Regions:
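Metallo-beta-lactamase
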Residues: 1-17
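A short, compositionally biased
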Residues: 6-9, 94-95, 113-116
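Conserved beta-sheet core of the metallophosphoesterase superfamily
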Residues: 17-112
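Polar, enzyme-active/binding microenvironments
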Residues: 110-130
Length: 132
């Protein structure tokens, strides 16, 4: 794990076409935050500000060629049962994380949801052994 400073404006470039940020754009409903992030996209972005699992793509044509941008929110690994301080006891949050495969130019982002302490990724079940 590498610390990226200057919260909330720090950036970590995974490659030439994908950056990780904290993020600041929020949509009230599921899917709206990634759509807002794609509005002025010039690079694909992974962000976590909204604590939801969301993913969207946008194709922009330039010089007769498609350029595809992606915005991804990977959810949260925080508790979502109201114990985490916030403005409400119940939010539209989802637990999850992401796995990114990449080279210098291309990437693949997989979102992995965590449901009641369990995830399935590439056919294998992962289960929390933590305490309540």
């Amino acid at each position: 794990i590498q610390y990226v400073g200057n919260y909330p404006s720090g950036e970590f470039y995974i490659n030439n076409n994908l950056v990780c940020i904290h993020g600041h754009k929020v949509g009230a409903k599921s899917g709206q935050s990634v759509m807002k992030a794609l509005g002025d996209a010039r690079i694909s972005t992974i962000f976590g500000h909204v604590h939801r699992l969301e993913m969207a793509h946008k194709t922009i044509w330039t010089q007769g060629r498609p350029k595809i941008y992606q915005a991804v929110s990977l959810g949260t690994i925080a508790r979502i049962d109201g114990i985490v301080p916030s403005g409400s006891a119940r939010h539209n949050w989802q637990q999850g994380f992401g796995v990114v495969e990449y080279d210098d130019e291309n990437f693949q982002v997989d979102t992995v949801g965590i449901y009641e302490g369990r995830s399935i990724y590439r056919g294998k079940v992962y289960e929390s052994k933590g305490t309540d």
